[in-house]
């Protein structure tokens, strides 16, 4: 291999999300991964510094979030209704993501592979629930932004995503919802 890993990561900007929905503005997995990293870092800090709960390193949570969709460089973005249609499809797609992640790791110099392995394969232990919460929060924010632009296409997704976040029972996520989410509904002059 010619160390294609970083070049492929640069192509994240070409993989759009929400492919089954009419969007007022597109979102790619590079933008999404950045937002998830910011949110994962925030959730970990909230958990540790505001709620006083044990938490993994917030900086490592941000790094885990940066790579949480890296396998989609090779697989594309599978729409959620398909990915989670039933347990068999979910398990099969997880296997596809794992194979894609292994393939990405092969594109790194061997000396770097172990440093990236946990992040690319999402084997991040106690960081994973925070990254998953941040991922869901990012999806919710996308719904809110689309609704704010007058797009009712995201109304059902907004309700379903909010319900899914509440089911996660993550106190740091609930704190963010209660204290930080409302400003996403405001325009620039209102902020």
Task: Label every model-predicted segment.
Residues 1-191:
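Alpha-helical, largely C-terminal catalytic domains
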